[in-house]
């Protein structure tokens, strides 16, 4: 009962993904989740709820799975026209390989975990793979932050290695930055670093973050978020292209 969360949450993200799938003209979705993974299973469930269970084929894979060929085959054989896979980047890279090998023939949708240079690296050169993600930030949204982040990444070879070998600005990095400063604002408001005082001050924080304004509605522990960025993986340039913003209305 002591958490506060500044990112958008899965009920919102699942609905955004479903709305975007519909905007692409999708009518039947293949949904793949990792068994026992709360994020993966939960986001699929929220997508299915918004898209319509009668329009979805659902499967799960086990921990340690390395061959995803059967899942790609099942998506195609079931006549699906969108492939939803909110899974880890490790699993994603393998799914992308299979999608390219078998010529999946339908867009892949995923959540914020896929907003990573691991994904664009895995997809580079695979022009028969179309990937869209929902996420918190698009590089270029805040030039001052982007420049400072890239300077820091390039200042140390360890930083560069930890960022996947390049200075791409991942949305999770920006979210971590904003979370730090929301906590700092709460400490300032409390006038103390005492945990109880900071916890009491957090609900009143209103912070203009890199990812947008961050505030908590009365009694809420999740920040109010009403829009997500939709990005497309450019397999030629190995960067994320901004498609636009998507809400739940």
Predicted regions and their residues:
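An alpha-beta-alpha
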Residues: 2-63, 81-82, 171
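Extracellular/periplasmic bilobed ligand-binding domains
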Residues: 43-139
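Generic detection of short hydrophobic beta-strand segments and adjacent strand-loop junctions
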Residues: 59-61, 214, 246
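Extracellular/periplasmic periplasmic-binding protein-like sensory domains
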Residues: 99-177, 232-236, 240-247
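Residue-level signal for short, function-critical loop segments
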Residues: 34-36, 137, 186
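Sec-exported extracytoplasmic/periplasmic mature domains
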Residues: 19-27, 48-53, 73-80, 97-104, ...
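Stable alpha-helical elements in mature extracytoplasmic
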Residues: 13, 17, 25, 39, ...
